[in-house]
């Protein structure tokens, strides 16, 4: 009986230690992180809606593509122009495009440094005007590739926290 009690105590201590390690692991999936990511998405959506002069909702497909693209590029310190963008072809004339937001002041046209926010340190989330303008210019280029009559029909923003830094990718749907 004594051995069973000791074994039970050891098992409970092990389970508690694992629970503590898991809780303190900082995986970036806790409620505060999710709240910060949602706030970043809202701020960027508002800025994009202002730029387009329309009231788009955050499109789920574009948001998911944005988050997947952030995850795919997370390990890279800098990105090339091709790595900055991701495309998802829905049909021959309908495409979703996303761009990871980057720090214009640290980028040189060949290597783009991803911009990020740290939830504990960021008092406000301010989308960089130059990045938004670059996105709009490149979006016009992408629209031209689809066709002269192509239109932007949806916008989306995805945010993902990786190793304590929250990255944002913005995107649109082009239909021609």
Residue ranges of predicted features:
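Bacterial Sec-dependent N-terminal signal peptides
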Residues: 1-11
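A well-ordered secondary-structure block
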Residues: 91-176
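Generic serine detector
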Residues: 9, 75, 80, 105-107, ...
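Short, conserved catalytic or interaction motifs in soluble domains
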Residues: 26
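Short, low-structural-confidence N-terminal segments
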Residues: 11-14, 34
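C-terminal motif of bacterial Sec signal peptides marking the signal peptidase cleavage site
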Residues: 19-23
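Short, well-ordered surface patches within globular domains
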Residues: 29-100, 155
